[in-house]
Amino acid sequence: IVSPPVCGNYFVEVGEECDCGLPRNCQNQCCNATTCKLIPGAQCEDGECCERCQFKGAGNVCRPRRSKCDIAESCTGQSPDCPTDRFRRNGVSCLNN
């Protein structure tokens, strides 16, 4: 049995763009708690690449490199999420010498 989405339960479900709980409890300025939709003009409501309801610009580092083999990840300007953690390609030496 599949139940319909419920706005106000803190879970983003099918048809919702955000869900910050009941209107009296909502602390998210980007989300309309009554409709579970982003407020007009908002691109996002949460994520490493979301700031003040807008996507951070392309090139903003969202995950710095942690080792010589790691590659720093940057926001794309098109998503609230930081891209998948990536590493240098196989065959490239990254030992600490």
Curated annotation (Swiss-Prot):
Q: Recorded GO terms, molecular function? A: metal ion binding; metallopeptidase activity; toxin activity
Query: What general EC class does the enzyme of this chain belong to?
Result: hydrolase
Q: Can you cite an annotated GO cellular component?
A: extracellular region
Q: Which coenzymes or cofactors are required?
A: Zn(2+)
Q: Which residues are glycosylated?
A: N32
**Main location, first listed in the record:** secreted
Q: Where is the Disintegrin domain?
A: 4-90
Highest taxon of source: Eukaryota
Question: How are cofactors bound according to the entry's free-text note?
Answer: Binds 1 zinc ion per subunit.
Subcellular locations according to the entry: Secreted
Describe tissue expression: Expressed by the venom gland.
Q: Does the keyword Hydrolase apply?
A: yes
Database matches in PROSITE patterns: DISINTEGRIN_1, DISINTEGRIN_2
Q: Give a single Pfam family match.
A: Disintegrin
Disulphide connectivity of cysteines: C7-C36, C18-C31, C20-C26, C30-C53, C44-C50, C49-C75, C62-C82
Q: Where is this motif: D/ECD-tripeptide?
A: 68-70
The protein's UniProt keywords, in alphabetical order, are: Calcium, Cell adhesion impairing toxin, Disulfide bond, Glycoprotein, Hemostasis impairing toxin, Hydrolase, Metal-binding, Metalloprotease, Platelet aggregation inhibiting toxin, Protease, Secreted, Toxin, Zinc, Zymogen
* GO annotation terms (biological process): proteolysis
Oligomeric state and interaction partners are given as: Monomer.
Q: What does this protein do?
A: The hemorrhagic metalloproteinase-disintegrin-like bothrojarin-1 is a potent inhibitor of collagen-induced platelet aggregation by blockage of alpha-2/beta-1 (ITGA2/ITGB1) integrin. It does not present any fibrinogen-clotting activity.
The molecule here is called: Zinc metalloproteinase-disintegrin-like bothrojarin-4
Name its species.
Bothrops jararaca (Jararaca)
